[in-house]
């Protein structure tokens, strides 16, 4: 089954890429690699959390993180928005919401409001800050797949693991067009839990209170 294949692939990734690199319990980029690379964020994006803490510590360490996001390789000056945006999404999805939001705010202020071009870029100095639509899409996916934790499971179904930042009381995602439907997602704090509602045409099709980090299955 696909699940069996996914489990086998996860074990293979851990066996080959799992590594202690520059003092961090994270991943190497290839066999023989001993320098941190920003692409260590990819397992987090794919829901592999075996080395979460070491990977997040490495990503936001001075070796990789700069005012402009992640260096593609420690010790260089080239930064890539693509790996930065993946890393922010993966960090939030892994449950490190406050750290992820802190760096997301810094990135957003710098890139969207700062003294650089006002959009997510490809890379610098490589690429000369090109505007690629993929990077803008990845910025949006921090919210849809990081904060709301949406993951498709079928043509009309998905899972979601909402991550509501501590300083927020609620978050909504309205008029989502996906899974052959148009629907709204509403998440609000309810004591120590999160109350989640899915609405179609203004009518609730799901109401559920869950603990932080719990996954909800949705069929539309």
Language-model regions, residue ranges each:
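Active-site core of glycosidic bond-cleaving carbohydrate-active enzymes
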Residues: 4, 18-142, 146, 150-152
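Non-catalytic C-terminal accessory modules of carbohydrate-active enzymes
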Residues: 93-220
